């Protein structure tokens, strides 16, 4: 295992920890701009989920429990880090392709529920690795 201290200190997308934390912070910012009740967010009508990036993100977050179990069974925490990096990549693609704060309340709340679920996964995955999940960067 080679640890690159210079890479670990960088604050850009080449640093996998920064990349994951940045996804978490981006989600925090969108939810902050919305300023609604996050506890009440849920997907109310799955028919609005049609975007390929949404489907990829849903698939990615659904794989979290299995990724954690496998990492624990194999004593391989790096697998969690690899999973989180892939999940963050799916989120960043979705973020770059999607408007979240839109007039259609149903679609907006479904999208916000999806990114909130993603934020939950990223935060808990980072926590398992002993890494912070900042809301701002």
Residues covered by each model-derived region:
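Non-catalytic interaction-recognition regions
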Residues: 1-137
